[in-house]
């Protein structure tokens, strides 16, 4: 009947199945399955179900502290395990910025699919010819790729470098840019409360980050002192914020990132392993 097993669920609907089956389960949440705008009216009901799932799980692993605040279930047993940097590159040398002139290379590293990132790049192209914007990654749909191609045709300071190998290419990528752009929008719930690995990559490579105000990521950046948050809803708002950026400000942020211990930003399974061992001992007894 499954009572002698601990099932590990990686999803919302899988956890519903295990809950109905009445077997012990652990629940991992890496995004909110009903966090997209199309779920708007049904979200209160789906959230109520989710709160019941985490309450009855042996434990719930969250990849963002922001999920914990959203679920607001004090009776649940949570463990927060953000997607941090792969330990494969833990020995890589960290190089703080030493900018000397008003030429900044802004970059987005990852799957290119966010309208807010495209807006940021377009703003650099249109208003800041002295700067550059680099895309490192692949567009997820043809229309996004066409939009990038159109921008590159209009603005020579926008560049696309394509796919990369994670984490092997990170040292080359991050050492070739100055600022990491993580201006995820606020249109989707998931974008508002996620804690992306780009935060920890930026910190490790001592590159200041720019996030969108009103997001959990912006709170994290403020807590670490590793960047700034802006209104990214329009090109004009982005332009006005970027005009205030200075060489000294970026260099100071980079030096502060360098002071953060590297262990702080790398993946560790210690907490999860300890918890699983504890649960297994209890079940044997």
Where are the model-predicted features located?
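Membrane-proximal helix-turn-helix segments that form the acceptor-binding/catalytic region
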Residues: 16-20, 27, 33, 41-62
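Nucleotide-sugar-dependent
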Residues: 115-116, 166-173, 180-201, 211-219
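Conserved donor-binding/catalytic core segment of Leloir-type glycosyltransferases
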Residues: 61, 97-116, 120-125, 133-137
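A charged, aromatic-enriched C-terminal amphipathic alpha-helix characteristic of glycosyltransferases
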Residues: 232-239, 247-281
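Short N-terminal targeting/anchoring amphipathic segment
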Residues: 1-14, 24-26
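Nucleotide-activated donor-binding/catalytic signature segment of Leloir-type glycosyltransferases, i.e.
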Residues: 137, 145-176
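Donor nucleotide-sugar binding/catalytic pocket of nucleotide-sugar-dependent glycosyltransferases
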Residues: 34, 51-92, 111-114
């Amino acid at each position: 009947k499954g009572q002698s097993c601990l099932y590990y669920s990686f999803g919302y609907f899988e956890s519903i199945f295990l809950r109905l089956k009445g077997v012990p389960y652990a629940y991992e949440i890496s995004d909110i399955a009903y966090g997209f705008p199309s779920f708007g009216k049904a979200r209160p009901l789906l959230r109520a179900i989710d709160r019941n799932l985490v309450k009855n799980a042996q434990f719930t692993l969250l990849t963002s502290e922001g999920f914990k605040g959203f679920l607001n279930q004090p009776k649940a047993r949570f463990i927060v395990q953000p997607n941090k940097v792969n330990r494969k590159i833990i020995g890589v040398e960290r190089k703080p910025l030493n900018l000397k002139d008003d030429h900044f290379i802004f970059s987005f590293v990852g799957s290119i699919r966010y309208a807010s990132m495209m807006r940021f790049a377009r703003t650099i192209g249109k208003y800041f010819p002295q700067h550059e914007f680099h895309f490192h990654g692949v567009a997820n749909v043809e229309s996004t790729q066409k939009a990038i191609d159109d921008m590159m045709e209009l603005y020579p300071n926008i560049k696309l470098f394509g796919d990369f190998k994670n984490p092997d290419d990170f040292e080359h990528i991050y050492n070739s840019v100055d600022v990491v752009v993580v201006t995820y929008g606020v249109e989707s719930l998931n974008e508002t409360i996620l804690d992306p690995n780009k935060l920890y990559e930026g910190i490790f490579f001592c590159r200041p980050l720019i996030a969108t105000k009103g997001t959990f990521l912006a709170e994290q950046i403020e807590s670490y002192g590793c960047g700034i948050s802006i209104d990214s809803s329009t090109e004009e708002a982005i332009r006005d914020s970027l005009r205030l950026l200075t060489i000294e400000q970026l260099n100071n942020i980079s030096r502060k990132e360098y002071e953060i211990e590297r262990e702080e930003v790398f993946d560790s399974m210690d907490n999860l392993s300890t918890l699983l061992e504890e649960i297994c001992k209890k079940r044997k007894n």
